[in-house]
């Protein structure tokens, strides 16, 4: 048994999720995957009801219902998210509560692509989910195979419209319900789907292999030694002797060298993604570093004022605004560890944004911040969260 456990840890880990229109079978498919893999000893079977009764979680001040399911294939370990309601999907994808490396787009062959099919594809594109595998569900309910071909063509065209390789994306046809009920042919289809996901969705670059980035939370001076910036390492690794840049909130970038590293008041050889560390910076005085800046590997991230964001605006019930807002609205954008005021410009044809909407708009920040496509932020007004977003495009 001990050997088996060791083996499981060496499998690469991938985050995926089911997306698609309501009632097209996302949760049924999730349940079917766990059932079929459980028969091979690679998962715990979870029934529809237990997945559908997704627990509430809070992510950046927003309540989201999400079911987290784990399973393995021969090659990999997967964490799979499934959300019961459409609003939960939108919030999940925008807040990054569940960062997906790839997605299974579920489309019912009986309906073809529907409004939320399109919306989920757009969201996946905006938040940086680069790989999609399609599961055409309920094919047992369509008598004419030509109709299924037609639906597949529509789905491929829709994916191409949002810059996915629609012609090349794998499409698997089947019935999640039949697989869940134990139909041997459909169980084979589920295995085929999992093999396809293993092959098509690449293993993500591990957080520790990405360039070093640490948002600064606190700054203090150690007499006789210098200035220490502390925070949680977002990605990458850092060690004594590394060159770093101090970036954000001011027009100039300061270069420094790491001369000391501490965690829990003990010295540390190497800090890595997830660690809360204090970084001693050579030749930097207390006034040159502040909360809200980042320490980063030189050249890995730039300062920007203008960006396009994909944003979910909280409802009144979620503690958000009670009224709509218009272009030139000036809230604070909380990036990394600090608030920066920004001016919002709504897209043509969008008069106003209501609480509960998700929307793409342009932002012009009054101070430059170290951001890139995929950086998460919250929108705040007087300290309370009114929205959550992700940078979908840099504009300057």
Swiss-Prot record:
It comes from the Bacteria. Its EC number is 3.6.5.3. Keywords: Cytoplasm, Elongation factor, GTP-binding, Hydrolase, Magnesium, Metal-binding, Nucleotide-binding, Protein biosynthesis. Residues 137-140 are annotated as: G4. It is found in: Cytoplasm. InterPro entries: EF-Tu_GTP-bd, EF-Tu_GTPase, EFTu-like_2, EFTU_2, G_TR_CS, P-loop_NTPase, Small_GTP-bd, T_Tr_GTP-bd_dom. Residues 175-177 are annotated as: G5. GTP binds at residues 20-27, 82-86, 137-140. Residues 20-27 are annotated as: G1. Residues 11-205 form the tr-type G domain. One of its GO terms (molecular function) is GTP binding. Belongs to the TRAFAC class translation factor GTPase superfamily. Classic translation factor GTPase family. EF-Tu/EF-1A subfamily. This is Elongation factor Tu. It comes from Lacticaseibacillus paracasei (strain ATCC 334 / BCRC 17002 / CCUG 31169 / CIP 107868 / KCTC 3260 / NRRL B-441). The gene is tuf.
